[in-house]
A protein has these predicted regions:
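Short, solvent-exposed loop/turn segments at secondary-structure junctions
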Residues: 53-57, 79-80, 113-114, 140-142, ...
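A short SAM/SAH-binding and catalytic strip from SAM-dependent methyltransferases
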Residues: 105-119
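N-terminal accessory regions of S-adenosyl-L-methionine
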Residues: 1-46, 149-153, 157-159, 164, ...
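Conserved beta-strand signature within the Rossmann-like core of class I S-adenosyl-L-methionine
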Residues: 130-144
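Class I SAM-dependent methyltransferase core
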Residues: 49
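Conserved acidic residues
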Residues: 45, 105, 132
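Class I SAM-dependent methyltransferase SAM/SAH-binding core
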Residues: 52-98
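Class I S-adenosylmethionine-dependent transferase superfamily signal
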Residues: 126
Length: 215
């Protein structure tokens, strides 16, 4: 689908060839806005894709801004990192946290921060690796209740498994982010949330764009 002029309404993780999904179109075009903002007045951009699977956003980024040279770095579990490196030998893949030893123009975590048991530690590490912008998106958020843990079964997105993830209270999340010297630039609604059985409140999936406060 990326080789055509069809809409960006595709799921990077799904085998479906549908290109008119409004939710996925919103996710990718929102990312395009962030990528354009981070690359202003730049011919080359360094990007860390935290939890980026096999590197789908390497190709998506190239299609969104074709003349931008992207120094792409992706962190995920070993199986995905190894396969991604085979697919994209010019990119950089990691199965550990050694990618956090440097800074990036854009740090991007889409649908991944909530799976860190100690999400505060991960957020702090991502903030410290950010020189330009930090974009946390597809994050389950609640407003009136405390953060809680839920079980996710993402079969429709191509993952034949289930796992635990956080649903974070928005005020708590933003307070922790501010404590790491992150300035909130913009909030986004990223996607429709699946129903969570027996939850104290149903989550909404939000995105948050930050910039580090220069000290």
């Amino acid at each position: 689908n990326l080789e055509t002029t069809l809409p960006f309404g595709i799921s990077p993780e799904s085998s479906s060839e549908e290109s008119a999904n409004i939710m996925f179109h919103n996710i990718i075009i929102t990312y395009g806005y962030v990528l354009a903002l981070a690359s202003r007045q730049k011919s080359e951009l360094s990007l860390l894709d935290w939890g980026g699977g096999i590197g789908h956003y390497y190709l998506i980024s190239q299609k969104l801004i074709p003349d931008l040279i992207i120094d792409y770095h992706c962190k995920d579990v070993p199986t995905l990192a190894e396969y991604g490196q085979e697919l994209f030998p010019k990119a950089h893949f990691y199965s550990d946290e050694s990618c956090l030893s440097r800074k990036f123009d854009l740090v991007f975590a889409s649908g991944s921060l909530q799976y860190s048991q100690n999400w505060q530690h991960t957020l702090k590490a991502l903030a410290e690796a950010t020189s330009g912008y930090l974009f946390i998106t597809r994050l389950p958020i609640v407003h009136q209740v405390a953060s809680y843990v839920m079980v996710q079964r993402p079969y429709e997105y191509g993952y034949n498994t289930e796992y635990l993830g956080w649903c974070l209270n928005k005020d708590e999340f933003l307070s922790i982010a501010a404590s790491f010297n992150l300035r909130l630039i913009r909030e986004f609604i990223s996607q429709v949330s699946p129903y969570v059985n027996n939850a104290p409140a149903q989550p909404q999936y939000w995105g948050f764009l930050f910039a580090p406060i220069k000290i």
